C-alpha cells in the first residue's frame, strides 16, 4: 500500500495482515480524499483523528497532504506497532500521536482541542460505530464545520444526521465497504 498524494507520495506503508484486518484500498482512499477536497478542505488547517486506525493509511494520507496533526487510536498491539513504524519511516512521528487504547475509552474523555476531520473505521461486525459516534459527538471532539467519515460494512444502517446535527454530504459503496461523509451543522 502506498501514499497517494502529497509530501510522502509513493512511499510504502506497512500493513497488518491476518483475520480482521482490512486496510483501506487505494481507490477508496482516493475517492474519500477527493470528496473532502471537493468540499473545500484546506489541509494546512486540519487536525485529523483516525479511530480504529489499523495501519493508519487514512491519517498518514492526511498528513502527507499537509494536515497539521493526526491522532491515531488503535488498541490492537500489532496494529499499533505498525502505526509507529509507519510514522517513523515516513518521517511523520513528530506530527502524530498513537494511542494504543480502546477507542470507546479514549473517546469518553474530552480532547485538548477539536478535530476538523474524524474518521471512524470500526471492525466489521463489532457494533462499535454508534457508541463511538455518541462519545465523539457528546465529548466535543468535532470542530464546527468539521467532517465525520465512516468506513463501514455496506449492510450497516446508520443515520446520525438529526440526532447529532450532521448533514450527509456524500456516500459511496465499494464492494462490501460503504464510505459516508457528514459535515457538522453550525
Regions found by a protein language model. Give the residues of each.
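Class I S-adenosyl-L-methionine-dependent methyltransferase catalytic core
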Residues: 1-186
Amino acid at each position: 500500500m502506498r501514499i497517494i498524494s502529497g509530501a510522502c507520495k509513493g512511499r510504502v506503508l506497512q500493513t497488518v495482515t491476518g483475520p480482521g484486518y482490512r486496510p483501506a484500498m487505494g481507490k477508496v482512499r482516493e475517492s474519500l480524499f477527493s470528496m473532502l477536497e471537493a468540499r473545500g478542505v484546506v489541509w494546512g488547517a486540519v487536525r485529523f483523528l483516525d479511530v480504529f486506525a489499523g495501519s493508519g493509511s487514512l491519517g498518514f494520507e492526511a498528513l502527507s497532504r499537509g494536515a497539521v496533526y493526526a491522532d491515531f487510536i488503535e488498541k490492537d498491539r500489532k496494529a499499533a506497532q505498525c502505526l509507529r513504524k509507519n510514522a517513523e519511516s515516513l518521517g511523520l512521528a513528530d506530527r502524530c500521536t498513537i494511542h494504543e487504547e480502546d477507542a470507546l475509552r479514549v473517546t469518553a474523555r474530552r480532547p485538548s482541542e477539536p478535530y476538523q476531520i474524524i474518521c471512524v473505521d470500526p471492525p466489521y461486525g463489532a457494533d462499535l460505530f454508534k457508541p463511538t459516534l455518541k462519545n465523539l459527538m457528546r465529548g466535543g471532539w468535532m470542530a464546527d464545520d468539521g467532517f465525520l467519515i465512516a468506513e463501514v460494512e455496506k449492510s450497516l444502517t446508520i443515520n446520525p444526521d438529526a440526532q447529532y446535527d450532521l448533514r450527509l454530504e456524500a456516500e459511496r459503496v465499494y464492494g462490501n465497504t460503504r464510505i459516508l461523509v457528514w459535515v457538522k451543522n453550525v
